[in-house]
Regions:
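Conserved, well-structured core segments that form or line functional sites
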Residues: 3-171
Length: 171
């Protein structure tokens, strides 16, 4: 197990071996796991509720289908357990976890999640809407973290975090 100090809290992280497996298996097993993002020394935690697998050798929807390497897709070829973050429609960031062996372009997209605590919900609501969780409208509450771009905005994830190791202390 990888033990990490995240925001002053000792946590057991998933190992590289967890990510170095079949992408569909990893996608299923990520459901219910917690993602911790440290911002200004404070950990924000969400439970992963929806994932989607992309396998470059098989899936035409994968950015690196057919082993296509570009500046954008280079992170998909990184070691398993690497964060792959990219921008879609010029405005929404998407977080993926690289899976399978290095050089094999495959990843799991995090599609949705839910805050673990009221404090996490407040911090994420502030990032998304500029208000506390209690002040969110019913519509905002219903659609809080139900999309990859919404999840990234709530966790303040951008392309600046692309390539981060999931074994480290920031994610």
């Amino acid at each position: 197990a990888v033990i990490s100090n995240i925001g002053g809290e000792t946590v057991e992280k998933l190992t590289r071996a967890f990510y170095d497996r079949d992408t569909l298996t990893v996608a299923r097993e990520l459901l219910g796991k917690r993602l911790v993002r440290v911002i200004d020394g404070r950990p924000l935690t969400l439970r992963i509720t929806e994932t989607e697998a992309y396998i470059g050798r098989l899936d035409k929807a994968c950015h690196a289908y057919g082993y296509k390497r570009t500046a954008r897709t280079e992170t998909l070829f990184a070691p398993p357990g690497t964060a792959y973050i990219y921008l879609i429609y010029g405005m929404y960031h998407c977080l993926n976890f690289v899976t399978e062996a290095a050089g094999e372009p495959a990843a799991v997209l995090l599609r949705a999640g839910e805050p673990v605590s009221p404090a996490d919900a407040d911090a994420m609501a502030q990032s998304r809407f500029g208000c506390s969780a209690e002040e969110m409208s019913p519509y905002q509450r219903k659609n809080f973290l139900n999309g990859p771009g919404k999840l990234c905005k709530a966790l303040k994830l951008t392309k600046a975090q692309n390539g981060l190791s999931l074994l480290g202390d920031e994610l």
